């Protein structure tokens, strides 16, 4: 399970967000979307309580909804931006531009935004809220942001 492998639900979710929008198909492994920690035997029936972690299930559902809604997130041109504590990349398709930021550390960090993203009003599409971008953005431990410009 990603939760066991990465040490926490938040670390597993950060890893999922960091990789799902990179390029290609979204991979969700058996019961990952409910935070099921025990191994699943693929050759035998395993009962899974789908109400086990409804908040995680809803978070995966929202993220996959965004993945399906915006072609740029699935198939857009990928532009990476190096940062030591944050996985940061842009996905764009000529219609929409998105910045995906994932704090990969178990501590709060700040990251300087790329020039084209500074001093603009954008939208945090996961939270569905306007976001005023300055020179840098602060991310809590293992927090992610999906920003539409």
Roles of regions detected by a PLM:
Residues 9-13, 23-28, 32-149:
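Carbohydrate-interacting/catalytic domains
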Residues 1-7:
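Active-site clefts of carbohydrate-active enzymes
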């Amino acid at each position: 399970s990603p939760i066991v492998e990465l040490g926490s639900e938040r670390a597993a979710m950060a890893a999922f967000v960091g990789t799902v929008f990179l390029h290609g198909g979204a991979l969700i492994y058996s019961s990952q979307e409910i935070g099921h920690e025990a191994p699943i035997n693929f050759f035998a029936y395993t009962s899974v309580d789908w109400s086990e972690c409804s908040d995680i299930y809803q978070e995966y559902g929202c993220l996959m909804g965004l993945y399906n809604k915006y072609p740029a997130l699935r198939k857009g041109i990928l532009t990476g931006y190096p940062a030591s504590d944050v996985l940061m990349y842009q996905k764009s398709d000529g219609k929409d531009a998105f910045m995906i930021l994932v704090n990969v550390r178990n501590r709060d960090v700040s990251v300087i935004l790329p020039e084209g993203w500074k001093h603009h009003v954008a939208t945090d599409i996961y939270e569905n809220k306007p976001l005023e971008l300055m020179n840098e953005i602060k991310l809590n431990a293992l927090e992610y942001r999906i920003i539409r410009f």
